[in-house]
Amino acid sequence: MSVIVKEYSSKLIERFTQEKCRLSKLLPTDIKIEHVGSSAVFIGGKNIIDILIGVPKRKDMISIKNILTKNGYFEGSDNHEDRIFLANTKEETGEGDFHVHICPIKEESYENFIILRDFLKNNPEKAQEYLKKNTNLQKKLILIAKNTKP
């Protein structure tokens, strides 16, 4: 499947807000729901809405995954010890799909999503560079962002 980069649309923010509201009703109150990825920093991309769900402890990831799979999400193959990936479609459609990343709040994987999002929001020129070189640049920008934290 070829990757099609689309222009940014404010409808992605609306869709995130609606899905966050729906998820908030399904999930425990001690979790965090954050908008991350290119749509969170107002740049184009694959028209995917990345949602970061922060859980208090690593052991909580499975229960959140189970709730989401019972409510329309599919487990993806890009899982790690400190992150579970789910999507609301089995294959990317480019029509505002949701990708959910479940991570423990106090672990590096969670912090990296937040650091990268905030760095790109505050550095529009880097955000455009990120859009062009997404995969290779992501790790580099996380390191830069960590070194420029106040």
PLM regions with names:
Residues V5-K11, L52-I53, L116-L120:
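Short histidine-centered catalytic/ligand-binding loop motif
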Residues E108-P150:
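Catalytic cores of NTP-dependent nucleotidyl/adenyl transfer enzymes across multiple folds
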Residues L23-D60:
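Active-site nucleotide-donor binding segment shared across nucleotidyl transfer reactions
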Residues N71-E107:
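Conserved catalytic core of two-metal-ion nucleotidyltransferases
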Residues M1-E34:
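Helical scaffold of the NTase/Pol beta-like nucleotidyltransferase catalytic core
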Residues S63-N71:
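Short amphipathic alpha-helices in soluble, non-transmembrane regions
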Residues M1, N47-I51, G96-F98, L116:
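Short amphipathic alpha-helical segments
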